[in-house]
């Protein structure tokens, strides 16, 4: 298997990471992030050059992997909205992980929920995308601080938090079938990139794995949009 290339999801996160690393005035992060999104994914980029091939692949039954990178719907909409000079530029047609990936390096360097939500909405302007992204960040934060069972700790801390109602219900659904094989669980909740399926599949991998490596291998084997799940 050829390795060395990251997914479009991870690339969004890397664009934010590089933006943060090269920004002196933190008030300009969103402005510069938008500029870098267009530079990395827009006209002239390897993603943009693959647009016609992407359109073809959406119409046919896949037999082999598409050569080159795949630009996400959220990013296509974001680039369009940036050019239209919209205040909130994120995509609205899908509920996927772009917002989470963009916010991951930002959240851990700023630790501000309000500012993080603005970052999420910069590339994924939807309530579902925001809520699940914030939940993932909170769970990772718990693990980063040494919590041995971050998923259950998050559940306990937010059981009465209305903002996370949808997230809590989905974690409970996953826990009910924790003993089932991972491939079965991913197929049941959905292999596609969208929430809540991508979140549920990742949660199952986390709570049934003993290490990061085994969780990622399990995630890859389950197929579908394993990149969005593995980035969590």
Q: Each predicted region: which residue ranges?
A:
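Structured, active/binding-site neighborhoods that engage oxygen-rich ligands
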Residues: 1-232
């Amino acid at each position: 298997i050829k390795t060395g290339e990251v997914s479009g999801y991870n690339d969004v996160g890397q664009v934010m990471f590089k933006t943060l690393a090269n920004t002196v005035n933190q008030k300009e992060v969103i402005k510069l992030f938008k500029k870098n999104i267009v530079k990395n994914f827009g006209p002239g980029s390897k993603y943009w050059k693959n647009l016609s091939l992407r359109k073809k692949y959406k119409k046919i039954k896949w037999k082999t992997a598409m050569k080159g990178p795949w630009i996400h719907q959220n990013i296509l909409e974001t680039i369009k909205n940036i050019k239209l000079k919209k205040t909130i530029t994120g995509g609205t047609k899908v509920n996927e992980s772009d917002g989470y990936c963009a916010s991951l390096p930002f959240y851990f360097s700023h630790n501000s929920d309000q500012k993080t939500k603005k970052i999420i909405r910069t590339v994924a302007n939807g309530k579902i995308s925001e809520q699940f992204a914030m939940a993932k960040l909170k769970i990772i934060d718990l693990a980063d601080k040494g919590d041995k069972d971050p998923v259950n700790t998050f559940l306990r801390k937010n059981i009465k938090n209305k903002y996370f109602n949808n997230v809590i219900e989905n974690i409970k659904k996953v826990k009910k079938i924790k003993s089932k094989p991972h491939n079965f669980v991913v197929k049941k909740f959905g292999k596609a990139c969208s929430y809540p399926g991508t979140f549920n599949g990742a949660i199952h991998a986390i709570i049934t794995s003993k290490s990061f490596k085994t969780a990622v291998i399990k995630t890859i084997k389950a197929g579908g949009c394993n990149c969005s799940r593995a980035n969590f």
